[in-house]
Structure formats: C-alpha cells, structure tokens
Amino acid sequence: FELGFNGEKYELILSPEGLRSRLFPLVYFQQQAPESVLEHWNIWVGRQPSKDFMLRAGDMEIRAEDVQMWAEETEDQQVSLVLCCEKLTPLLKEDTDRVWWALSMLVDQTIGEVSAIAFVAGFDVYAQPKDKPAMLLSQLPELLQSMGLSLWRDGSDYLENSYLAYELEPVEDSEADWRLDVYTGTCRLPVIINDYLTARSDAVDEYHKDGIAV
C-alpha cells in the first residue's frame, strides 16, 4: 500500500500488484470503510495515473518520456508492449528484476494500475531499440483511447463493469470431469476457470490463506 496527502484528504492506495484476482479482496476492504473515515481519507484500489511521475533508480531519474514503446493490439482489446529505456540498459546486465520492476511502475503511473491490468496483456524489455518507429510510453493513454478504450480510475468501477466472455469446445463424454460440458459463459475472474481446467489451485490457495474461499 501507499500513503499520501492531496492537499485536502489523506490517501490510501491499495495495490493488487498487477493481479486481477487481488482486486476482489481489496475492493471488499475499500467498501467496508465507514463514512467517518471517508470524510478524511480517499481509499483507492490501484495506483493512480500521474502525468509528471518520475522514478529514481540509483543516480538516474526516469520518466515515461524516456521509454520507447512498440505496441501490438491483441484480439481481446488489449496491447502487448515492447519497452526499451536506454537509461536502464546498463542495469539490465546487473539486475534484470529491478529493470522490470521500474518499467512496470512506469506503466502503472502512466495509465493507472487498474488500466494496466485491464488493457496490457504483457510486455517485453529490449536492451536495444527495434528497427521500427517507436512511440513513447507517455503516449500510451492516447493509444488506448484511440482504440476506443476508457481508462479505469479505481478497481471497484472496473470489477463492477467488466465481464469476460469465454467459449470452449464441450466434452461430450459422459464420464468427463465436471464442467467440461460447459462451452460458453461469462465470468469476472477467468483465472479460477483456467486453474480448474489445468488442475491448479494458485488463486484459490491465495484466497484460502486470507480466509476468503471455503
């Protein structure tokens, strides 16, 4: 979480750390806040976009304008990104994880963390620019808006209005596992279905640890 003050109210920003599944418990927590608290506090789920955000990495200061971006639209109204920041290139050999963290933070601060979850399918980090014309990361909001997408400001609004549709080939064998005969539907958390179909339980296990799922 992050704490701040906007000149009028204190602000508590709860980060889902890039995971849609973590939005649900954070939104629930947000909605339990009493009115007496909300008189003095804004509680946000997801980092908010900040146009003038600057990230300090060691002796370097990095803004979204320092990051080159190549975007490819996916079939489900998302974008896959390739990012290259020459200021971070020397750090790639020493601490790759730190570079990924820095660029993830810049993406979140450019369009907001919830919008990043909703619209960014993923990104790769390149040490050298591609041989194609690049945009700047700071132009990502305009790119998404040109695709007809509206940025999400808060996790609660996103979850309330985002249903994902899916379609599968039904398994007609009467001895097949449960649910494999279901071929189309809508849901808000597709990772649960994916985990079930691949015999995984990562999301449910995380919920169990917090006493959410039974």
Residue ranges and their predicted role:
Residues 1-42, 46:
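An N-terminal, globular interaction/scaffold subdomain
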Residues 16-21, 55-60, 157, 188-193:
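Short linear motifs at secondary-structure transitions and domain/linker junctions
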Residues 22-24, 53, 91-93:
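Short acidic, gly/pro-rich beta-turn/loop elements at beta-sheet edges
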Residues 29-74:
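An exposed acidic His-Trp-rich patch
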Residues 63-180, 190, 194-210:
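Long, hydrophobic alpha/beta structural blocks
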